[in-house]
A protein has these predicted regions:
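Transmembrane helix-bundle signature of multi-pass membrane transporters/permeases
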Residues: 69-72, 76, 97-99, 123-127, ...
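N-terminal signal-anchor module of multipass membrane proteins
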Residues: 13-94, 102-110
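Flexible hinge motifs at transmembrane-helix junctions and intramembrane kinks/re-entrant loops
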Residues: 61-66, 177, 181, 191-239, ...
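Generic transmembrane alpha-helix signature in multi-pass membrane proteins
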Residues: 50-54, 104-112, 138, 162-169, ...
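Membrane-embedded helical hairpins/re-entrant loop segments and their flanking transmembrane helices
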Residues: 28, 54-92, 257-329
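Membrane-embedded alpha-helical modules
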Residues: 110-226, 332-342
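Intrinsically disordered, low-complexity non-transmembrane regions of multi-pass membrane transporters
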Residues: 2-34, 228-243, 278-282, 292
């Protein structure tokens, strides 16, 4: 796609259309349709970390549900902070936030030795550390010339391939992982996305991923592969209780390990920010990067208070922006609202 944006007014495709900018405000129905597309693209990755942590800590199902609820709620808050911005916090770019997988190993080790309260104590301190060092770390942006940026964008796509393959197989841990049914449904969904993207016009073409997800899920349900019984039995409304597992405790070895995780997150965020900046034609300089990293820090701190985890940009949504060509940060802000409501 390069830097050529793909956006439709009526049935006419336009390149670099002035209404398709990072600050474009789309009609409300389009905002939430495109926003839902982003949520569905990141949902499985968003809930994976709380599931892994809960299993490692042998938490009951009730606590797992609380972790997932808190995670999605904080994902929404973090996304709104990043997309809308408040003062010098938030990059004001279409960057959806989710829990970083880099934190899984350290959190499970901290939890096994010191319990959940030590996990959240380490997360809170690491978030505060990230917020404070953001302006200093952002100076490293000069180490990211175009050749490095291009390499980062390529690596983002390559690193997402195993994720796509695992999901097509049915998800790691699924007893039917790799079955012909799962793989066939995955390819069928992929073909639907490609067909809609290639042959549909206007608004529908931009929603190719969402249409593919809905069609694939409907086919899976008709085949008896998708089961929504647990959804029907679950509570429709849940409230987030800060410090549900108790007031945070602070083990400094645990804090140090989480700070190291956040250093990795800052590098990852730098690459994702530059990639998004290239896609949406908004150059990311030192000032902008510092704002993005501050948002990661404050979101991680909030996560520690609300029983969630460290936050970073989700790379699969970077790819989705490139595929759909819809640059508006308000689309991703709508995703944040949807995540809060979930």
């Amino acid at each position: 796609m390069g830097n050529i944006s793909r956006f439709y007014v009526g049935d006419t495709m336009t390149d670099q259309n002035p209404i398709n900018t990072v600050d474009s405000m789309l009609p409300i129905p389009q905002l939430f349709a495109f926003g839902l597309q982003h949520v569905l693209a990141m949902y499985a990755g968003a809930v994976a970390v709380p599931i892994i942590v809960a299993q490692a800590m042998n938490l009951p199902v009730e606590d797992l549900i609380r972790l997932i609820t808190a995670d999605l709620f904080t994902c929404g808050i973090a996304t709104l902070i990043q997309t809308l911005g408040f003062g010098n916090i938030g990059g004001r770019i279409p960057m959806i936030q989710g829990v970083t997988f880099a934190s899984v190993g350290p959190m499970t080790m901290i939890g096994a030795q010191h319990g959940m309260t030590a996990i959240y104590g380490a997360i809170i301190v690491a978030g505060l550390f990230t917020f404070i060092v953001a302006p200093f770390f952002s100076r490293l942006i000069r180490l990211f010339p175009p050749v490095v940026t291009g390499t980062i964008i390529t690596l983002i796509g390559i690193n997402l391939m195993p994720v796509a393959i695992n999901w097509m197989g049915g998800g790691v841990g699924n007893p039917e992982f790799g079955s012909y049914t799962n793989i066939g449904l995955g390819f069928l969904t992929f073909l639907i996305v490609v067909f809609v993207y290639k042959f549909a016009k206007g608004f529908l073409s931009n929603l190719s991923v969402l249409i593919g997800l809905i069609a694939g899920t409907a086919i899976a349900f008709a085949m008896g592969v998708a089961n929504f019984d647990e959804v029907g039995r679950s509570q429709w409304v849940a409230f987030i209780e800060p410090f549900y597992f108790g007031l945070p405790s602070f083990d400094w070895a645990s804090v140090l390990s989480m700070i190291i995780v956040m250093l990795v997150v800052m590098v990852e965020t730098t690459g994702d920010s530059i990639a998004i900046g290239e896609i949406v034609d908004k150059p990311i300089g030192r000032k902008e990067l510092a704002s993005v990293i501050r948002a990661d820090g404050i979101s991680t701190l909030i996560g520690g208070i609300l029983n969630s985890f460290p936050y970073t940009a989700f790379a699969q949504n970077v790819g989705l922006i490139a595929v759909t060509g819809v640059k508006s940060r308000f689309v991703v802000a709508a995703s944040g609202v949807i995540l809060i409501l979930l």
